[in-house]
Amino acid sequence: MSKLDLNALNELPKVDRILALAETNAELEKLDAEGRVAWALDNLPGEYVLSSSFGIQAAVSLHLVNQIHPDIPVILTDTGYLFPETYRFIDELTDKLKLNLKVYRATESAAWQEARYGKLWEQGVEGIEKYNDINKVEPMNRALKELNAQTWFAGLRREQSGSRANLPVLAIQRGVFKVLPIIDWDNRTIYQYLQKHGLKYHPLWDEGYLSVGDTHTTRKWEPGMSEEETRFFGLKRECGLHEG
């Protein structure tokens, strides 16, 4: 696999970018997760960042990437509406894994947003998308810019939802390389990694949550529900960070 030119790839239409990365992705599919991270650090430009929502399985990618590239900036976009358990989980993992945590928030506080727009998450798909743009997308774009990121690691997995089922290991999003080291892991592999390294699921896992985001758009799993239906009232799966 040869070195990739980010600037040249960004000038291509999206379809052509996908085709240009196809050969590299075919090779990356043959590597294990650690190998993919090592390859990215050797062949893709810095600065490097890792994003995390500190959700159910967050400890896996946080541990895996940070072990190979210690002190990598870890981007959290904090909406102000996370579960108390999530905030405590963030503190616990930051201390345990010695994370270089970088927290980004919307330029408007949660209270100010409610005063201006009402409860956007109760206003259908359009309201949810506006909420996500304000609280997730803009802060992430700002983080990537301020941290001079050119390569972005994330912990998405194909098994999590239909919208992620065909994602490649390597893509370009928001103008930077995006690497998904554990994209092909299943739930058993996640469990085995956590057990091997003495790591925990998010505390709400034991209470029946399969996915955890904001308090007002996360539901506990019930029989017959898919994981996708536990977020955003089943209207959306993605919060906007991993779209586009």
Curated annotation (Swiss-Prot):
One of its GO terms (cellular component) is cytoplasm. GO terms for molecular function: phosphoadenylyl-sulfate reductase (thioredoxin) activity. It catalyses: [thioredoxin]-disulfide + sulfite + adenosine 3',5'-bisphosphate + 2 H(+) = [thioredoxin]-dithiol + 3'-phosphoadenylyl sulfate. It is an enzyme of class 1 (oxidoreductase). It is found in: Cytoplasm. Catalyzes the formation of sulfite from phosphoadenosine 5'-phosphosulfate (PAPS) using thioredoxin as an electron donor. Belongs to the PAPS reductase family. CysH subfamily. This is Phosphoadenosine 5'-phosphosulfate reductase. It comes from Escherichia coli O139:H28 (strain E24377A / ETEC).
